Amino acid sequence: MAPDAGEGWGGLSTGHVVSRSVRDSALMLDCTAGPEPGDPYAAPMQEGSFLEAIARPPRQLRIALMLKDHRGARLHPECLAAVQRAAKLCDSLGHIVEEADPELDMVALRPLSARISAANTARSCNMRWKALGREPNADDVESVTWAVYQHGLKVSGVEYIEAIAAAHAAGRKMARFLTGYDVILSTTLAGPPPRLGYFDQNGDVQTFTERVTEYLSVTPLHNATGTPAISVPLHWTADGLPVGVHFAGRYGEEATLLTLAAELETAQPWFDRVPAL
């Protein structure tokens, strides 16, 4: 699960956990949610605990079903099967599911988000090298990290603010869309899990960038808009690999996502499913 966007990478990145149960995600969020004294930004606080929230019966939700990838193209067959299966399960549990799309230009957002992450990567690397008392050195990091670092050094202040403004505009459009829906259901990634080594951070930088850009598909949209989101494994390929489905909700409504995920976990348990090695 990824909670509301906070301060990391200009708001694009928020740390949480990869867990095997909704209970663990809820409990960890109870342990970490809320601002520290002096934080310049803060997400809305949850009334009560997230662990208590997942124990309550979920209310009926209006769910927008996205059946296209970030380019507006048809999904990979496994991903399409995953979201359709999840939609049927949600419908069987009493939720209202209909095909709808916030119609945000995810392709145009990519290079703008890349500016933000590159500039923040450059700052993080410089801080680390300073703490170590060393000069920036390509041998200290992966080739991809070094390329992103170099890009970040060249991002101007105006370019950075333009990118932040674009993310904020996308967030406002997403918020307007979510006045009509509680949750957006989409694929998590563009395809089934790739083989180890497919994303080689010490390989060709252009190849890595192209592969990551295509594989992440719709999830970077929610990094930009700040909407909380959660992925759950409701579909498995014939050879036993999990294909995630992705639920995104309104700003400040992590409890809605966790409650829905808990309901899905009860209806279709995944805890004991482990891919064959």
Enumerate the language-model features and the residues they cover.
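Conserved short alpha-helical elements in the N-terminal third of ANL/AMP-binding
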Residues: 221-224
